[in-house]
Amino acid sequence: MGSLSSALAQNTYKLIAGSSSGLPDPDGPTPIIPDVFSTWGDYYNYLQQKEHDGISTDTVALMAIAKHNSGKIVEHEHHYKPITFGISLTKEIGKNWNVETGLQYSLLKSNFILGEGEYYIGRDQKVHYLGIPVRTSYKWFNSKRWSAYSSAGFLLNIPIHGKNSVRYVTGATVPYKDSWYFTPSVQWAVGVGTGLQYNLIPKWSLYLEPSFNWYIPNGGAIHTIWTEHPFTITVPFGIRFTW
């Protein structure tokens, strides 16, 4: 859909959810909207006042959703554990000490629900980040194939892009869908971890590194697992080159 449609969808969601929706300002033309509503009854009354011949499909769906809900409008959000894959470049600086950098891709998925039961507005969010880690590690176990180590350092996560997909659900039907792209904020993190490494061939290995991280508040409006749960355990895995 065009930018106007996406702008309308974003503003409709922000109109109902309020400032806590975590949505950025939309691209494209911005429709005139009243103050944010706090109850479903108020929102339904507003939609009835707008009702006219040739009413749009999305407004009909919103009226049905508002009619079948009551009380205060509350947004429920759920954030999934991130998926993180890395390519690590590790330099040995002593018998057991290493320094590391590389690239680390992370996918953050969340869903948000406005409404209850079979009548609701659902929003699925995906945010893609490319991280640059800088860490030091100490190897405390080493054999021919396996090694174990502990690490500490920081990570700069650079946003690639984000996408929101919204759907209006009325019983067994989904009469309206839309989606739009956005750019989230840069995200810094510091953390510690303990990793397990399997040596494939000389210099090349696979690793799995459960880590405890603090994602430093970035002041952005987008809600992710990193912003809502800044102290988070992640389990990066990937390929490592050591020299």
Regions found by a protein language model. Give the residues of each.
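Residues on the lipid-exposed face of transmembrane beta-strands in outer-membrane beta-barrel proteins
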Residues: F85-K91, T101-Y105, I132-Y138, A152-L156, ...
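Transmembrane beta-strands of outer-membrane beta-barrel pores
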Residues: S19-D25, Y105-K109, W140, F154-G162, ...
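Predominantly the C-terminal beta-signal and adjacent terminal strand-loop region
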Residues: T183, Q187, N199-W243
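C-terminal structural cap/anchor segments
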Residues: I132, T136-F141, W146-A152, S165-T170
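Extracellular/periplasm-exposed beta-strand and loop segments of Gram-negative cell-envelope proteins
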Residues: Q48-H78, L108-Y129, P159-S185, A221-E228
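Conserved catalytic residues of ABC-type ATPase nucleotide-binding domains
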Residues: M1-F85, T90-N98, S110
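Repeated loop/turn-to-beta-strand initiation elements of outer-membrane beta-barrel proteins
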Residues: N96-V99, S143-W146, K203-L206
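Residues that define the transmembrane beta-barrel architecture of outer-membrane proteins
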Residues: N11, H79-I83, K126-L130, W146, ...
